[in-house]
A protein has these predicted regions:
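Ferredoxin-reductase
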Residues: 2-92, 109, 144-147, 157-159, ...
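FNR/FR-type flavoprotein reductase catalytic core
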Residues: 81-258, 262-270, 276
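Local cysteine-cluster metal-coordination motifs and their immediate loop/turn environment
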Residues: 123, 289, 293-317, 327-340
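Short flanking/linker segments adjacent to small metal-binding domains or redox-active Cys/His motifs
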Residues: 174-175, 341-346
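Active-site proximal loops enriched in glycine and acidic residues that flank catalytic Cys/His/Asp
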Residues: 211, 237, 268-270, 279, ...
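C-terminal accessory/binding modules appended to enzymatic or scaffolding proteins
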Residues: 259-303
Length: 346
């Protein structure tokens, strides 16, 4: 049964040369609240066929009655081009959600660093909207090519001006002459280890990291080199997903202990590996990676079906419901954990 419902475009606002925001409402039907950092899933009927895409919610989670997504126009992105060129105020888009586990830890009390690259700032802006209402110290760090592609800058500047303890730093890779005249950026080039070290006070921060894979890999390695514990870094990719820790530190083939008697076990039958499920991995996909396997994946959120695998024994629980119905004997390993001992054809 489809969980998609139509959302009407009530406003369309160009935020930069490449990014446009769409404000969405559901008429008289209340919209589900969302956690800062979550996204909506869209089925978009482009001239070349229907596509499924995720777009982060970029507005305030306290703005009841409507959602906002901010979409970057991609050269090879049929869905983003369609949204930019053809979708107008009054049109409807089919959406499902909110979804996603990349969310602000609102119960925490540590200072927060929101570190983004390009259109990766969109979930960070939603987080900033929530953080300004509290007392935690927040540093909003954003990197992009220049002022013409810097979306939501005025909004971020207004938010960090609302109370003490909030600040922003914008790094432009190739600032224009106009950027230099207006002086609305703080540094030039890319965020370096030395620069991040100078911006961060000696403290125990929670880091949230979002952007394209090259930016993410560089920033993750830099933060780790500064001694930031990996448990303090939450991240989400904009673009093809990968595993940051594996990219930064290729791991040797792991030692696989013999399964314990009475434990829930996971058997990767084709690989000849059986191991205990201890709960240390956050999903069956993560466990497979811990065992040195390389299953296909992309979204890590139950949406793209890239990780769909055959399960020949046992049951799983989904912590994120699959977007599409699965046939008997199929499982999405990116968003599931074993309920009983399981056998996967991997």
């Amino acid at each position: 049964m489809s969980r998609f419902r139509p959302l009407k475009v009530i406003a369309k606002i160009r935020e930069s040369r490449l990014i446009t925001s769409f404000h969405l409402a559901a008429g008289n039907v209340p919209l589900e609240g969302f956690k800062p950092g979550q996204f909506l899933v869209f089925r978009i009927a482009t001239p070349h066929g229907e596509v499924v895409r995720n777009y982060s919610l970029s507005g305030s989670p306290d703005a009841l009655g409507h959602y906002r997504i901010s979409v970057k126009r991609e050269d090879l992105g049929g869905s983003s081009q369609y949204l930019h060129d053809h979708v107008q105020v009054g049109d409807s888009l089919l959406a499902e959600g909110p979804r996603g586990a990349f969310v602000l830890d609102e119960a925490g009390n540590r200072p927060v660093v929101l570190l983004s690259g390009g259109v990766g700032l969109t979930p960070m802006v939603a987080m900033l909207h929530r953080l300004v209402k509290g007392t935690r110290r927040v540093l909003f760090l954003h990197a992009c090519e220049g002022g013409d592609v810097h979306a939501l800058r005025d909004e971020v500047e207004a938010l960090v001006a609302t109370r003490p303890g909030l600040s922003a730093h914008f790094c432009y890779r190739t600032p224009s002459d106009q950027d230099r005249q207006t002086k609305r950026f703080h540094s030039e080039g890319v965020f370096t280890r030395e620069q991040l070290q100078s911006l961060l006070y000696l403290d125990d921060y929670d880091f949230y990291l979002c952007g394209p894979p090259p930016f993410m890999a560089a920033m993750y390695q830099t933060l780790c080199s500064l001694g930031v514990p990996k448990t303090r870094i939450a991240y989400e990719f904009f673009g093809p997903a990968t595993v940051l820790e594996a990219a930064a530190n290729p791991a040797p083939k792991p030692f696989v202990a013999a399964p314990s008697e009475g434990a829930i076990t996971v058997e990767f039958r084709k690989s000849g590996i059986t191991t205990d499920w201890t709960g240390a991995a956050d999903s069956l996909l993560a466990l497979a990676e811990d065992m040195g396997l390389s299953p296909e994946f992309s979204c890590r959120a139950g949406i793209c079906n890239s990780c769909k695998s055959s399960i020949t024994a046992g049951e799983v629980d989904y912590f994120e419901d699959p977007l599409d119905d699965l046939s008997p004997g199929e499982v999405l390993i990116c968003c599931s954990r074993p309920k009983t001992s399981v056998v996967l054809e991997l």
